[in-house]
Amino acid sequence: MAYESFRPEILAKELMVGRGRDCVFKNLTYKGPILGEITKKGDVLHIAGVGRPTVRDYIPGEDITLEQKASHNQDLYITEAKYVNVEVDRVDKAQAQGEVFGVEVREAKKALAQTLDEYIAGFHTQAGNTIENTNCTSATILSTLAEAEQALLEADVPFEEERFLVISPAIYTKLVLGKIVFQQGNADVFGKGFKGSYLNFGVYVSNSIKRTGDVHHCMAFTRQAIALAEQIPASMIERYKPEKTFADAFKVLHLYGGTVIRPAELIRVDLTTAEETAI
């Protein structure tokens, strides 16, 4: 995109497309209907259809109970408002015929996507179950991942439900050293960070995984576990000329929020790496 052809509506779309190339966690979130509009921080959206009805015993001759369900099951609050404010030097812009602006847009897009993924990774604190391995090596990691799969099965996750395992690069190395064989898929289809399938998990690697000291807070979860809503309103994108400088600039506001809608389908996998005794 050339700076001269700047249009807020076009830039808003450009910053939001291609999330599969820029994010890991964002592509693994709930895909069902989320009702409402995002215009500012503090907006409330409604997640529809994530609850399950109650099954009751039928007794002939007695009235049956009508379960009253709200039009939505859970609220989602827009809690995050992140911005970038980028200067584009007019001399550089002229020399590069607008390409400098295109580079700045791409870098802004990547930076916003990275911040978004780090936000979603923080939901490990709301997991319904935690599995620990304080001596994670290539020899012990398989049993830990099997426990994570077991936890999801015990949460009544259907076999056909999409389930994901997101790990840090250090933990992925343990899988490689353990000679774990992944069922390969098309990374262009599955998105950024995809390494293959194992134990019914789509395995992804992300630098957004949170750490506490030497503990890597990896996450095993289903598509139904985490919901996210985001927007970059065209009204919150501006091109302007800063004072006291020969430069142009643009600023962008990214609004989003998320929530855990099925804690039982989110497993926190705390892994502390240990030295390998044999490779």
Summary of predicted features, one role per range:
Residues 2-19, 24-26, 34, 38-43, ...:
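Signature of extracytoplasmic/envelope-associated structural regions
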Residues 41-46, 52, 64-66, 72-96, ...:
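Structured, hydrophobic secondary-structure cores that serve as assembly/anchoring elements
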Residues 1-74, 266-273, 277:
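N-terminal "assembly arms/tails" that initiate or stabilize quaternary assembly
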Residues 41-49, 146, 153-236:
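Extended oligomerization regions of viral-like shell subunits
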